[in-house]
């Protein structure tokens, strides 16, 4: 449980704070120093409700922050003809990116392609079973509201970072601004975003 919280906190700090910290001399207050997970690489998976421009951009910026802080070796992130395509980006991360600390797991990518009737329940079932019994993922990036809703539960204890969710509290992803309700789930919450 503690490792899950550490993994989620680490990725959230890197993705949200690194751009701010990289231009400041106060990095000592926000340590994002790369480290292994008990001598092993952190294993990361990804899920989304379906292709969406913001999801790819959020993933690209997260990877840039990971590069800026040394978690992933600096490289040119491939462009895509489809600005909402995270699959090709994930394949590149899994196959071609280099890191001594992270492994983007090739077969730990799920997109429901906005199919709420068939693909979403199927993906949720497969993901939750793997997270509970697979012991091969340390952290999930849940991009968007559907992904956050599907992974924010007590059925598993793998760290989850929810990004690009419209309203995590109203959507039932987290319980409040101050507490997600789960030790292994982190989501960015801005209560004034839609005021």
Predicted regions and their residues:
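Short hydrophobic alpha-helices and adjacent helix-cap/hinge residues
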Residues: 2-195
């Amino acid at each position: 449980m503690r490792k899950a919280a550490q993994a989620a906190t680490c990725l959230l700090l890197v993705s949200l704070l690194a751009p701010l910290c990289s231009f400041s001399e106060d990095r000592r207050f926000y340590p994002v120093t790369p480290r292994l997970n008990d001598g092993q690489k952190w294993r990361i998976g990804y899920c989304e409700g379906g292709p969406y421009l913001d999801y790819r951009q959020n993933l690209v910026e997260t990877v840039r922050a990971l590069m800026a802080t040394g978690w992933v070796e600096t490289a040119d992130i491939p462009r895509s003809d489809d600005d909402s395509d995270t699959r090709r980006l994930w394949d590149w991360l899994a196959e071609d990116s280099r890191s001594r600390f992270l492994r983007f797991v090739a077969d730990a990518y799920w997109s429901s392609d906005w199919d709420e009737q068939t693909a979403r329940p199927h993906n949720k079932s497969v993901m939750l079973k793997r997270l509970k019994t697979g012991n091969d993922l340390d952290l999930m990036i849940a991009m968007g509201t559907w992904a956050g809703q599907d992974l924010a539960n007590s059925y598993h204890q793998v760290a989850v970072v929810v990004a690009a969710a419209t309203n995590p509290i109203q959507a039932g992803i987290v319980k409040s601004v101050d507490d997600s309700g789960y030790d292994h789930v982190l989501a960015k919450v801005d209560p004034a975003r839609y005021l």
